[in-house]
From Swiss-Prot:
This is NH(3)-dependent NAD(+) synthetase. Its EC number is 6.3.1.5. Disulfide bonds: none annotated. It catalyses: deamido-NAD(+) + NH4(+) + ATP = AMP + diphosphate + NAD(+) + H(+). It comes from Listeria innocua serovar 6a (strain ATCC BAA-680 / CLIP 11262). Pathway: Cofactor biosynthesis; NAD(+) biosynthesis; NAD(+) from deamido-NAD(+) (ammonia route): step 1/1. Catalyzes the ATP-dependent amidation of deamido-NAD to form NAD. Uses ammonia as a nitrogen source. SUPFAM superfamilies: Adenine nucleotide alpha hydrolases-like (SSF52402). ATP binds at residues 46-53, 160, 189, 211.
């Protein structure tokens, strides 16, 4: 199988979608998971104010609200967690996103003290973290907090990973990539926008430039700058359309380079890396 055939088979992106149908597909998927696992009662999600967490949060709240209405069980809850490192540059967007999704519970945990303590402890041991490595430390601290909250509320940590992000491995291993359930996987970036438009989301939340915003020295660095390829090109590639050869090569290189992120810890029986 050629590399593009393999990528398209793995990422499961349809060339065209019906936004309403995809919304229902994700909501029913989330509901089915909790109904099957009756010891679980909540969804926990970190909210940044960007497109992906806004969409995921809205879908999670819809699923929880429907479960409560269908079962009469008020223990079903959604926890939307703000996890700033100090002060977030686009805090107003995060508040707009929270207002749009209207979560049952809003929590804020500032991760700055925890991250800075880890950086200082490592420095004391002779390990000086680069700004990039510190960015990954932030992502992992955020996930640690979400799992702590989930542990206290019979919760599932929901991920925001979609296929345009998965194909490039554009997330932190065991950080934002370390979740329990990903309701957006199969969608690319533009399809996520279509779902938010269908849901009546304020446009500025999905038309803004996507950024992981993890590095202190490069605040709000656009994803497309970091990747060297645009989301339109990634989306076209995943929909089976023609893209410039250099863009295709970059996408395929990211896919190969980050394949380890899409696997659990490697064992002697794995051969994908060889």
């Amino acid at each position: 199988m050629e590399i593009r055939e393999r990528i398209l088979a793995d990422m499961q992106v349809a060339e065209t979608i019906d936004a309403h149908e995809e919304i229902r597909k994700s909501v029913e998927f989330l509901k089915a998971y909790l109904k099957k696992n009756t010891f679980l009662k909540s969804f926990v999600l970190g909210i940044s104010g960007g497109q992906d967490s806004t969409l995921t949060g809205k879908l999670a709240q819809m699923a929880i609200s429907e479960l409560r209405a269908e079962t009469g069980d008020d223990e079903y809850q959604f926890f939307a967690v703000s996890l700033p490192y100090g002060t977030q540059l686009d805090e107003s967007d995060r508040q707009d996103a929270l207002d749009f999704m209207a979560p049952d519970n809003r929590l804020t945990v500032n991760i700055k003290a925890s991250v800075d303590a880890s950086v200082a402890a490592l420095a004391e041991a002779g390990v000086e973290l680069s700004d990039f490595a510190k960015g990954n430390e932030k992502a992992r601290e955020r996930m640690k907090v979400q799992y702590a909250i989930a542990a206290m509320h019979k919760g599932v940590v929901v991920g925001t990973d979609h296929s345009a992000e998965a194909v490039t491995g554009f997330y932190t291993k065991y950080g934002d990539g370390g979740t329990d359930i990903n309701p957006l996987f199969r969608l690319n970036k533009r399809q996520g926008k279509a779902l938010l438009k269908e849901l009546g989301c304020p446009e500025h939340l999905y038309l803004k430039k996507p950024t992981a915003d993890l590095e202190d020295n490069k605040p709000a660095l656009p994803d497309e700058v970091a990747l060297g390829v645009t989301y339109d090109q990634i989306d076209d590639y995943l929909e089976g359309k023609e893209v410039p050869a250099d863009a295709a090569a970059k996408i395929e290189n990211w896919f190969i380079k980050t394949e380890h992120k899409r696997h659990m810890a490697i064992t002697i029986f794995d051969d994908f890396w060889k």
